[in-house]
Amino acid sequence: MKVILTGATGYVGEGVLLECLDNPLIEKVLSVSRRPCGHMHPKLEEYLTEDFMALRAGDPRLQGYDAVFFCAGISSVGKKEEQYKVISHDIPLHFADIVGPRERMTFIYVSGAGNYNHTDQMWVRVKKSTEDALGRKGFRGAYNFRPAIMWRYKGQLHIQKIQYLFWAMYPLVKLFGGWNTMSEVGRAMIAAARDGYPQREIEVQDITTLAGRL
């Protein structure tokens, strides 16, 4: 399987990247990012761009893959809706428009855990709008991953300070099932791209289920 991955310089994207590089089901990973990811591997190719919105349909480097793992994103904390919408809505939808052929690809979008019935929350409105729009793009499969706390993958370089706080909560959260390992998240994406899944919204327990299929 050949995949395009975004967000390799962030925590989630890097973890998924490392799982893909270690996983024998993955033949090639094209990392599309603004900066080098800091890893080297025979499977890995990097495509650096300063502006995702400047990428154009028909770009031969973005064609012929089996899946997109769109892990790029930012926190909504301290962001105005217009700013957050560009990163979490406009860019992923533009990226979905320029890769192809869509009918042969699976698009996986990293959304986030939360109550998606509370549309008065800015980040929920934006993420839900993105999820719904991706489902109408004509991909072979489109899945919205909603992970919560994730335990790091061995060898990760891009770790924000807040992750250490989350990890301190790990023993407690583990009791209630609100966590995944980064390896599980990556394996779940690979499984969804290969085999599909009955629902488009992939919650924490669905990630565990999908990861167990590999």
Residue locations for each model-derived region?
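Residues at the starts of beta-strands that form the adenosine-phosphate
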Residues: 2, 26-28, 105-106, 141
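Conserved Rossmann-fold NAD(P)-dependent oxidoreductase catalytic core, especially the SDR/UDP-sugar
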Residues: 35, 82, 86-130, 136, ...
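N-terminal Rossmann NAD(P)H-binding glycine-rich loop of SDR-like oxidoreductase domains
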Residues: 2-23
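NAD(P)H-binding glycine-rich loop region in Rossmannoid oxidoreductase-like domains
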Residues: 3, 38, 45-94, 98-101
